Amino acid sequence: MRRPPGDGDSTGEGPGNWGLWGAQESRRLCCVGPDRCGQALLQIGINMMALPGGRHLDSVPLQEQRLHFMQVDSVQRWMEDLKLMTECECMCVLQAKPISLEEDTQGDLILAGGPGPGDPLQLLLKRGWVISTELRRIGQKLAQDRWARVHSMSVRLTCHARSMVSEYSTISRTASQEMGQAEKLLMEKCSELSAVTERCLQVENEHVLKSMKACVSETLSLLGEHFGQLLELALTREVQALVRKIDTSDNIYITESTTGNLFGLTQEGAPLCRIIAKEGGVVALFKVCRQDSFRCLYPQALRTLASICCVEEGVHQLEKVDGILCLADILTDESHSEATRAEAAAVVAQVTSPHLSFTQHLTSFLENMEEIVTALIKLCQEASSGEVFLLASAALANITFFDKMACEMLLQLNAIRVLLEACGDKQRVDTPYTRDQIVTILANMSVLEQCGSDIIQENGVQLIMGMLSEKPRSGTPAEVAACERVQQKAAVTLARLCRDPDVAQEAVRLSCMSRLIELCRSPSERNSSDAVLVACLAALRRLAGVCPEGLQDSDFQQLVQPRLVDSFLLCSNMEESFV
């Protein structure tokens, strides 16, 4: 199931998502040394991704008649076994795992299954990953004063850098003076690092070695800066070529292939998205979305735009080319396929994300908000799959944070009825991620006084009560977190709605107080979430003000009467009884 863009969930990057050298708070590399060294490595950090390598060889069982070899030298036994082996991967394994007395859990890095001929982007990404990983590991070994390892890794780093420069020069289109200068500076620093680490091997005086360590850190820092500059220059040139091809091509197959390549680059992280935005990627993609001859490419182009707009530069470019107006036109034009409108909803969800501060000043969005909200409600109502509903509801949820007028529009458009009806349709609402979007909309709409009567009319209190019992099916961290958000927002919605006495009486009739007490007292019911606990305590206190007779004395004295912080501390320290 696709996750909504701009949803704010913190998910770990999968093995297919490895970013670039940009300074990202959540992707800092572990490098110990002077500040400049750490900063340089931070600037070139690439997320770890296991490159496809050789598979582990299964151990070959020994026959009983060969048990005597167990007492023989291990090398001799290996030589005997080698006669019977026909595995073609043995040499690969030997190359990847050098014989060494030094324990190193990661071993040496090799490029397995390297980029094909004429594929400069993959070459840059793979070589870039290897080099930045080597830089990080050199920093770690330097902090441990493992000088022999630092020197050997520095030599290997020089080889990787030379290979990247040589291979890219072979397949790149044209050479530039700026690129040549960056390559020269990088190789000079690589040679300097190898030379200074070699001298360190011959020094025994600790005081001299300590001063030389600072010199190595400085060199490593500068090397990282030069590598980052070279990689950015090379990637910028390749992105320019892709954008130019999209912008000038009138061939649907070339445009489709190039747009797909651009989308692949957006999955490599925010730094590449910034490069794409700066080099006109947003402008070129909206040009595709405005040509009827490319209608079949709209979903792919919009999906790429949603990825680019995770960075500030992408959103600014979108506003410059009247992207919001284009999205509104696509969403309101029913001649477009459902897939196209769903991808347009994904872009809207991204650019209205409440977690991105730079999206809060889109004046063009306010001008088109009514049309967009109306189209999104209709898309939710007519969605043929859970993914389409998820994208449309995620956009609506983010819009309710974006502007207060959106909640009033949703109320007038009978959004509560549409959303609550969808909750009973397993084809549209089948995951906690989707219910998270629905309850977010309800929580934000519940600040309106008129909302309570609509909720009761559509049997909404019972559905909200059901959300208080949301449980993960798979147990994955992302799904567990989504369930916690559903429980928390359901409790918040209930607390807000219970200002209306009719809603409060309905909640008491449906035994909401019992469920709230259970969530407060039983950590496992709320996955030990403090956010859920606070929301449930607030909702329980609101209900107790309307119907105090629904509480036992012990519950009232522990959960309602004390200050909220005291009740919170009491419940958060509770140990469950398994008797």
UniProtKB/Swiss-Prot annotation:
Result, substituting S74E: Abolishes interaction with GPSM2
GO biological process: asymmetric cell division; cell differentiation; nervous system development
Region (Important for interaction with GPSM2): 74-89
Compartments, as annotated in UniProt: Cytoplasm; Cytoplasm, Cell cortex
Chain location of the short sequence motif PDZ-binding per the record: 576-579
UniProt superkingdom: Eukaryota
Function field: May function as an adapter linking the Par3 complex to the GPSM1/GPSM2 complex. Involved in spindle orientation during mitosis. May regulate cell proliferation and differentiation in the developing nervous system. May play a role in the asymmetric division of fibroblasts and participate in the process of stratification of the squamous epithelium.
PANTHER family from the UniProt entry: INSCUTEABLE, PROTEIN INSCUTEABLE HOMOLOG
Protein name: Protein inscuteable homolog
